[in-house]
Regions:
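Active-site neighborhoods and metal-handling regions in enzymes and metal-associated proteins
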Residues: 1-211
Length: 211
């Protein structure tokens, strides 16, 4: 993973009416993914070659770039290449992501159902082990959640680091238990669990308060 808790790769994509070039760490692209991309007319190039590519582009193009967010080095190269005309505008992909189609909505629902099953199994195990007198900590919460989520064949990665906060720790903003600093769970009080996962069909973010 290029970004923690995110199953995506850092990349640039240069798209024109006649070609598409994906700049990515090609060593991380599986043969299956490479074949699929090439079948769809997408050429792979190394991530670090994007600036050199843009500087050498000779085909006249008007390039849409969201200037408030685009990498400044990329923007400079675009501006300095006489073959390229930069047009500032909102990334159309962001606009499209803001409105889900029926397939995306259905997949999101299935991801949440799948995650709910993992959450129920987690709570059953947590309660039964506490009732049996076992010593559990905030770190144990993370371990149990990961066990049930990762057992699903569509699981990819946690969508963020699990926040398991018992008692007074739940009042701390973005609290995170560590091996050096964590609380032991008791059969009283409150346990706040903020967690989520990314599956092939959707991403979840679940906040639970367990008494």
């Amino acid at each position: 993973m290029d970004i923690e808790c995110t199953p995506y790769a850092m990349a640039y994509c240069y798209v024109t009416p006649s070609r598409a070039v994906l700049f990515i760490n090609t060593a991380r692209v599986t043969p299956e993914a490479k074949a699929e991309l090439e079948t769809n007319g997408i050429t792979l190039a190394e991530y670090d070659d994007v600036l050199k590519f843009l500087a050498a582009e000779t085909e006249p193009q008007t390039v849409l770039a969201e200037c408030s967010t685009v990498n400044y080095a990329v923007y400079q190269v675009l501006e300095q290449n006489p073959a390229l005309t930069v047009k500032d505008g909102t990334d159309p992909l962001l606009m499209m992501k803001g409105v889900k189609n029926e397939t995306e909505l259905a997949h999101t629902k299935q991801a949440h159902i799948r995650d709910a099953v993992a959450m129920v199994r987690f709570q059953i195990e947590l309660e039964s082990r506490l009732a049996a007198g076992e010593t559990l900590t905030e770190l144990t919460v993370d371990e149990i959640l990961h066990k049930y989520r990762s057992a699903d064949d569509k699981f990819l990665v946690e969508s963020f680091d699990t926040i398991a906060a018992y008692g007074g720790n739940a009042a701390m903003m973005h609290y995170h238990a560590t091996p050096e600093d964590h609380a032991v769970l008791q059969r009283k009080g409150f346990l706040l669990v903020d967690s989520g996962a990314t599956y092939l069909d959707g991403t979840t973010d679940i906040l639970s308060l367990i008494h």
